[in-house]
């Protein structure tokens, strides 16, 4: 099987709900997405514009809860960022914590002060 020019392949369960989609994202890059029994997206794995891989996890309602690109980013049930763990521009490890509204509350870097 060969699908060209913005093609994708979807699979469906016995209830006619989409379960998996394999193909291209809006930027023409590869992506695989999974869905639950309510047709809500549960995960997405693929490439982004700079060629980096990206993994996104969604809750049962299709809301983003975890994003892994160059850092691990978490979100609450309202879609607000709650934490970020990764590497800062200087190459040091960094951790950000946010309140339930997405406001930054705490930051720490691995470099000794």
Model region roles, listed by residue range:
Residues 1-3:
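Short, small-residue-biased leader/transition segments that mark boundaries at the very start
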Residues 9-12, 18-22, 30-35, 42-45, ...:
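Fold-core signature of tandem repeat domains
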